[in-house]
């Protein structure tokens, strides 16, 4: 019944995913109702389901369609009362934010920074963190100072401007959720406290690997780097995510909703300087 729009799909459309062969229907996530099943005992017709990753939209046709044909092993049943637009905002984006939150081992006293705060994952992370850890002090970075008010409304306590990959602050942080990736990694580490954790989750900076990185001299003593890969998914973790959203009354509604006929406009918005939060397409 719907799906999220992701920057990785824009990268693929632009030709940066070398393993993808065209023509190909894009789309790495979806939510909906099973209309036909070859495993009716586990996923009978009428079941509410989620699917993400697993080479959907890459090795085989993805979710930018009215119907999606998926391998049974990547179809996950979920129990949720969310409406379709909100449910469509959850799978890839909130799953990534949820995994990042767990890997950072957040404590109430932490000063937490999100690099790439206005992205879908950045906004989702803010909502999850403030739902479960309301006392943690949350900072968000953005290249566009004009998004400050919207970031504060989304749950950030303070906003820091990012100038070409360098944060305009002398502050250091206990935990950093880095959604920019390798292009900003050195600067992120420079703002990580001793004993702090940085979780690299995204590649919004458009760079896939870190050049000339010496783990001894560049990381710094007592600092920790981890990562989260949203392709590592199972039904239990997805249900735990939906349960958390319900338990803490988290508003997971998307920022923008488009129709199936307007996918081009949806990608254009996500790729624009005005983009904020999660963008979804609903097919009802």
Where are these regions (language model features)?
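Mid-domain Rossmann-like dinucleotide-binding core that forms the NAD(H)/NADP(H) cofactor-binding site
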Residues: 87-164
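NAD(P)H dinucleotide-binding glycine-rich loop of Rossmann-like/cofactor-binding domains
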Residues: 51-116
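Glycine-rich beta-strand-centered segment in the early N-terminal region that forms part
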Residues: 1-4, 14-56
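NAD(P)H cofactor-binding loop motif with strongest signal on the N-terminal glycine-rich segment
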Residues: 37, 117, 180
């Amino acid at each position: 019944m719907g799906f999220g729009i992701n920057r990785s799909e824009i990268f693929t459309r632009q030709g940066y995913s070398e393993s993808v062969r065209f023509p190909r229907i894009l789309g790495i996530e979806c939510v909906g109702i099973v209309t036909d099943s070859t495993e009716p005992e586990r996923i009978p017709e009428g079941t509410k389901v989620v699917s993400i990753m697993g080479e959907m939209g890459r090795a085989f046709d993805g979710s930018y369609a009215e119907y999606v044909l998926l391998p049974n092993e990547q179809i996950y049943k979920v129990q949720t009362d969310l409406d379709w637009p909100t449910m469509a905002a959850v799978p890839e984006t909130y799953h990534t934010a949820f995994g990042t939150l767990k890997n950072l081992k957040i404590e109430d006293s932490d000063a937490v920074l999100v690099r790439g705060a206005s992205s879908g994952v950045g906004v989702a992370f803010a909502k999850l963190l403030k739902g479960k850890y309301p006392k943690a002090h949350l900072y968000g970075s953005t290249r566009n100072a004009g998004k400050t008010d919207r970031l504060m409304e989304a749950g950030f306590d303070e906003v820091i401007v990012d100038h070409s990959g360098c944060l305009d602050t002398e502050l250091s942080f206990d935990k950093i959720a880095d959604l920019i990736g390798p292009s900003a990694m050195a600067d992120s580490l420079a703002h990580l406290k001793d004993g702090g954790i940085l979780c690299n989750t995204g590649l919004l900076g458009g760079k896939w690997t870190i050049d000339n990185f010496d783990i001894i001299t560049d990381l710094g003593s007592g600092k920790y780097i981890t990562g989260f890969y949203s392709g590592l998914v199972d039904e239990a973790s997805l249900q735990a995510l939906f349960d958390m959203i319900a338990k803490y009354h988290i508003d997971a509604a998307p920022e923008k909703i488009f129709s199936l006929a307007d996918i081009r406009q949806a990608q254009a918005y996500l790729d624009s300087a005005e983009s904020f939060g999660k963008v979804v397409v609903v097919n009802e």
